From Swiss-Prot:
Monomer. Its EC number is 2.1.1.172. It catalyses: guanosine(1207) in 16S rRNA + S-adenosyl-L-methionine = N(2)-methylguanosine(1207) in 16S rRNA + S-adenosyl-L-homocysteine + H(+). Specifically methylates the guanine in position 1207 of 16S rRNA in the 30S particle. This is Ribosomal RNA small subunit methyltransferase C. GO terms for molecular function: 16S rRNA (guanine(1207)-N(2))-methyltransferase activity; nucleic acid binding. The gene is rsmC. It is found in: Cytoplasm. CDD domains: AdoMet_MTases. Keywords: Cytoplasm, Methyltransferase, rRNA processing, S-adenosyl-L-methionine, Transferase.
Length: 343
């Protein structure tokens, strides 16, 4: 989070307009402009734990991480700058939440890359804060309006649900594979051995489907799940509860909040952060796994076949196996050995 995103660069073209404003930054906060822009006061609210980590170091308690923003999170703000995410339902959840808290008359700015679908903000907010496009640059659009009417926000209405082989999966906007089990996770699940025992860590757990499916065939495993996404953390907790599966679930930037060692780490790691391609999380997962695996423990991940993970696995563990593959995906397995510990 050092260089500014194109969306932030568009905002900087209007920096003089914000000097007297008390701003709430929210949405897809990919850089630290909220901490650096010259304003009368700045707050930030994010559903992404890794974004909060960066911003809180500079903004302290004025940066908040949670699924749902509260009145305290928007206190004294007269302007909202919202970074449009790539996921429209996620934007609707966040904007309806924020606009239900901000006072009528609040200035509303929405900024995002054109390819993210930011133009749909006009229709989404038409009944609450009619928007006009005020700038277009760096393949981004900047929209401005004023809050005329607060929406009614009910987080419970945003929950979704689907079934996988008799299991109930609870989902929220912004959670990976919200509408059904993705092909990569299906492939990874096909490799899991029934009657496994020991401590299992599910990194980037999403809606928790990998963990509950594993637990059904291996009820003696002890589950820990983590994700950077507040919606994913809440969805995983709900999925575990719906299937009567026990496990600890918490927010973590890969291993940042993880304590102890495990017999198995499973993951379908992301390779996007917002609209940007990023292999950082997966590489951190692979390299950090050796500090969180017991001797003889294994890392098992699924990834798009074109992604360059074999070299990182070999550098870290000394070797790896491909235990399942299709034309698009591969499941990699690496074992914690003395050779890996030296790495």
């Amino acid at each position: 989070m050092s260089a500014f995103t194109p969306a932030s660069e568009v905002l900087l073209r209007h920096s003089d307009d914000f000097e007297q404003s008390r701003i709430l930054f929210a949405g897809d906060l990919q850089d630290d402009l909220p901490a650096r822009l010259d304003t009368a006061a700045s707050r930030a609210h994010t559903q992404q734990f890794h974004h909060w980590q960066v911003l809180s170091r500079q903004m302290g308690d004025n940066a908040r991480f949670s699924l749902v923003a509260t009145v305290d999170d928007v206190a004294d703000c007269d302007t909202l700058i919202y970074y449009w995410p790539k996921n429209k339902p996620e934007a609707q959840f966040q904007l309806m939440n924020l606009l239900s808290l901000l006072p009528v008359g609040t200035d509303i700015f929405v900024v995002g890359e054109n390819r993210s679908g930011v133009r749909s903000a006009e229709q989404m907010l038409a009944d609450y804060a009619p928007l006009n496009k005020v700038d277009s640059a760096r393949r981004c659009g900047l929209y401005f309006g004023r809050l005329e009417k607060q929406p009614v926000f009910d987080a419970d209405k945003f929950w979704g649900e689907y079934s996988v082989d008799g299991l109930t999966v609870k989902t929220l906007p912004g959670v990976f594979s919200r509408d059904g089990l993705d092909v990569g996770s299906q492939l990874l699940l096909s490799t899991l051995t029934p009657h496994t025992k020991g401590k299992v860590l599910d990194v980037g757990c999403g809606a928790g489907v990998l963990s509950v499916a594993f637990a059904r065939h291996s009820p003696k495993i002890r589950l820990t799940l983590c994700d950077v996404s507040a919606p994913a953390v809440e969805a995983s907790r709900a999925t575990l509860a719906a299937n009567c599966v026990e496990g600890e679930v918490f927010a973590s930037n890969v291993f940042s909040e993880v304590k102890g060692r495990f017999d198995m780490i499973i993951s379908n790691p992301p390779f996007h952060d917002g609209m940007q391609t990023s292999l950082d999380a997966a590489q951190t997962l692979i390299r950090g796994a050796v500090r969180h695996l017991n001797s003889g423990g294994e890392l098992r991940i699924v990834a798009n076949a074109f992604l360059p993970y074999p070299d990182v696995l070999d550098e870290t563990f000394g070797f790896h196996e491909v235990i399942a593959q299709t034309g698009r995906f591969k499941v990699y397995r690496a074992i914690m050995t003395r050779q890996a510990k030296k790495g």
